[in-house]
From Swiss-Prot:
Role noted for this protein: This is one of the proteins that bind and probably mediate the attachment of the 5S RNA into the large ribosomal subunit, where it forms part of the central protuberance.
Pfam families: Ribosomal_L5e
Alphabetized GO MF terms: 5S rRNA binding; structural constituent of ribosome
A GO biological-process term: translation
Protein name: Large ribosomal subunit protein uL18
Length: 174
């Protein structure tokens, strides 16, 4: 508990485990738009956010649940859906006239081949400029969902569905 005159109470969002203020300060000082990737068990959310003195402004966003509009019926929380959501986000942002940003993964652990980097690969493949190293991207087999098709054996058409959804997304924005 806060006892004594020298005890410093952390900011509320830091206490809740929601904000890393040291990283946020570095991102704000760069004065570049942030590409914010957040994942949950069921979805992946991507936003293009610009910092202002009044508060952050969201310019563009995509959520993996939007993939249903393009015929994707698979699980929206996996690596395949993360890539497709990144692709959708990148094409939406380019259509609105934005060209790039820097990646912000917040308090999520950075591990190569994760859903965060699958989303980043989709963003980069769309032509949206985000500085990154290709070494962190998951393999193309994982992005297409071949590991899921191999595991499920009998009824997984995920790689074919991935290609069809990818073509529909490109068709809408070309």
């Amino acid at each position: 508990m806060a006892t004594g005159p020298r005890y410093k109470v952390p900011f509320r969002r830091r206490r809740e485990g929601r904000t890393n203020y040291h990283l946020r300060l570095k991102l704000l000082i760069s004065k570049q738009d942030r590409v914010v990737v957040r994942k949950s068990a069921r979805n992946v959310q991507i936003q293009l956010i610009a910092p202002t003195p009044e508060g952050d402004i969201t310019y563009s966003s995509a959520v993996s649940s939007e993939l249903a509009k393009y015929g994707y019926t698979g699980v929206t929380g996996n690596t395949t859906a993360a890539y497709l959501t990144g692709l959708l986000f990148g094409l939406k942002s380019l259509k609105k006239g934005y060209e790039g940003g820097i990646l912000d993964i917040g308090l999520q652990a950075s591990s190569a081949g994760s859903r965060v980097y699958a989303a980043l690969k989709g963003i980069v493949d769309s032509g949206f400029e985000v500085p990154c190293s290709p070494e962190v991207f998951p393999s193309d087999e994982r992005i297409r969902g071949e590991h899921i098709a191999e595991y499920r054996e009998e009824s997984s058409d995920l790689p074919e569905q991935f290609e069809a959804t990818k073509e529909k997304i490109f068709a809408e924005f070309s």
